[in-house]
C-alpha cells in the first residue's frame, strides 16, 4: 500500500467530478473489501468527563460548560456486562473510551481486566485513553488489545485552532508507541470544525503517509454541543456543518488513499439523511458505531440502522480475528 501520497495528489482527488470520485472509491473498495458488508462496533464511555484537555469540540473537557458530571472509571463487571449486551445486539468490536489526558498507572490493572474479559467473549477490543507512555502501550499490547484509537483530529495547520493543551506531535508520538507495542492503530478525525478543504487534504495526507495505514479510520462530522468552544462558536454560522457532498468526498478520498483500512462512519451520523449515509457506504465507508449514544452524543440507533440496512441491501460483517502486529524489539 502506498504511504507516499502527496498533498497535490490528494487535492486532485478532492477536485474530481463527484461521479468520477465515487467510481474510483467504489472500485478501490471492491478490490479490498467484501461488498455490502458493514462492521458493527459499540463505543462505551468507561470514564466520563473531567478531562483536563481543552479540545474545542469535546463536551467532556473540564474547560467546557456543558453541565456534564465527571465520573470515575467504571467497574470491570459493569463494562463486561455492557460488552455482552453489545455482542447480543450484533456488535463485533467493543470500543472503550476514557476522558483522560493519559491513563494513570494505578488504573492499568482494571483496564487490562476489561481487555481480557471482552476478548474472552470473542469480540475485537479497542481502547481510547489519551496519550500513552511506552510502558503503558506495552502493557496494553501484552493484554491482547486489538486496536488503540488516538485521532489526529484535523490537519497540522488547523490543529492549534481546536486544541492547545496537546500538540499534534504528541498525537503522532502516541501512535508510534502503539505500533511499537504491536497494537493496531485506529486514527481519524473530525470534519466541520471550521477547517478548509486544504485542511481536509492535510488531515487525509497525514494518515495516508503514516509508516503504516491505520487499521481503522473513523471520520466524524462535528456535533456542535452548546457549552463547548466550537459548539458555541459555530452553532450559528455556516461553518457548523460542511455540506453532505463534501463529507462524502472526504470519505471517498480516505478510501482511495487507504485501501485496506476500515473507514468508519462515526459521530454525526444521527443527523445525516439516509441518502447521505448511503452515499458514504458507496464511497467506501464500511464500519459504523451502533446504539443510541456515542460517548456523550446521540447516535442513529439500532432500529434505524436495521431499517437502513434492509433498504440498501447491506449486511453486518462477520467477525474476523484481527491481524496482530509484531511488537518492536
From Swiss-Prot:
Q: Does the keyword S-adenosyl-L-methionine apply?
A: yes
* Top-level division of the source organism's lineage: Bacteria
- UniProt keywords, alphabetically: 2Fe-2S, 4Fe-4S, Biotin biosynthesis, Iron, Iron-sulfur, Metal-binding, S-adenosyl-L-methionine, Transferase
Catalysed reactions, as listed in the record: (4R,5S)-dethiobiotin + (sulfur carrier)-SH + 2 reduced [2Fe-2S]-[ferredoxin] + 2 S-adenosyl-L-methionine = (sulfur carrier)-H + biotin + 2 5'-deoxyadenosine + 2 L-methionine + 2 oxidized [2Fe-2S]-[ferredoxin]
Q: What is its EC number?
A: 2.8.1.6
Q: Name one GO molecular function term.
A: 2 iron, 2 sulfur cluster binding
Kindly list the positions annotated as binding [2Fe-2S] cluster: 95, 126, 186, 264
Task: Write down the required cofactor(s).
Answer: [4Fe-4S] cluster; [2Fe-2S] cluster
Q: What is this protein called?
A: Biotin synthase
Name the gene.
bioB
Amino acid at each position: 500500500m502506498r504511504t507516499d501520497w502527496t498533498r497535490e495528489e490528494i487535492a486532485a482527488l478532492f477536485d474530481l467530478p463527484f461521479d468520477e470520485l465515487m467510481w474510483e472509491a467504489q472500485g478501490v473498495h471492491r478490490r479490498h473489501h467484501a461488498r455490502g458488508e458493514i462492521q458493527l462496533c459499540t463505543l462505551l464511555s468507561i470514564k466520563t468527563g473531567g478531562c483536563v484537555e481543552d479540545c474545542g469540540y469535546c463536551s467532556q473537557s473540564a474547560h467546557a460548560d456543558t453541565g456534564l458530571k465527571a465520573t470515575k472509571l467504571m467497574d470491570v463487571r459493569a463494562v463486561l456486562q455492557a460488552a455482552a449486551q453489545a455482542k447480543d445486539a450484533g456488535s463485533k468490536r467493543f470500543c472503550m473510551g476514557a476522558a483522560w489526558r493519559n491513563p494513570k498507572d494505578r488504573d492499568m490493572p482494571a483496564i487490562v481486566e476489561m481487555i481480557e474479559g471482552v476478548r474472552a467473549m470473542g469480540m475485537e477490543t479497542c481502547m481510547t485513553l489519551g496519550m500513552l507512555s511506552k510502558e503503558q502501550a506495552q502493557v496494553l499490547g501484552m493484554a491482547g488489545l486489538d486496536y488503540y484509537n488516538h485521532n489526529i483530529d484535523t490537519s497540522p495547520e488547523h490543529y492549534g485552532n481546536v486544541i492547545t493543551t496537546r500538540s499534534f506531535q504528541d498525537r503522532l508520538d502516541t501512535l508510534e508507541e502503539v505500533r511499537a507495542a504491536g497494537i493496531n492503530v485506529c486514527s481519524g478525525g473530525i470534519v466541520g470544525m471550521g477547517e478548509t478543504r486544504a485542511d481536509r487534504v492535510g488531515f487525509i495526507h497525514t494518515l495516508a503517509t503514516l509508516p503504516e495505514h491505520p487499521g481503522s479510520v473513523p471520520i466524524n462530522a462535528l456535533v456542535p454541543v452548546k457549552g463547548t468552544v466550537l459548539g458555541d462558536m459555530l452553532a450559528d454560522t455556516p461553518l457548523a456543518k460542511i455540506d453532505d457532498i463534501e463529507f462524502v468526498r472526504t470519505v471517498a478520498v480516505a478510501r482511495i488513499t487507504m485501501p485496506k483500512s476500515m473507514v468508519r462512519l462515526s459521530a454525526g451520523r444521527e443527523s445525516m439523511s439516509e441518502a447521505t449515509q448511503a452515499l458514504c457506504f458507496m464511497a467506501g465507508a464500511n464500519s459504523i458505531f451502533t446504539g443510541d449514544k456515542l460517548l456523550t452524543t446521540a447516535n442513529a440507533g439500532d432500529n434505524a440502522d436495521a431499517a437502513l440496512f434492509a433498504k440498501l441491501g447491506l449486511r453486518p460483517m462477520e467477525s474476523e480475528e484481527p491481524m496482530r502486529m509484531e511488537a518492536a524489539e
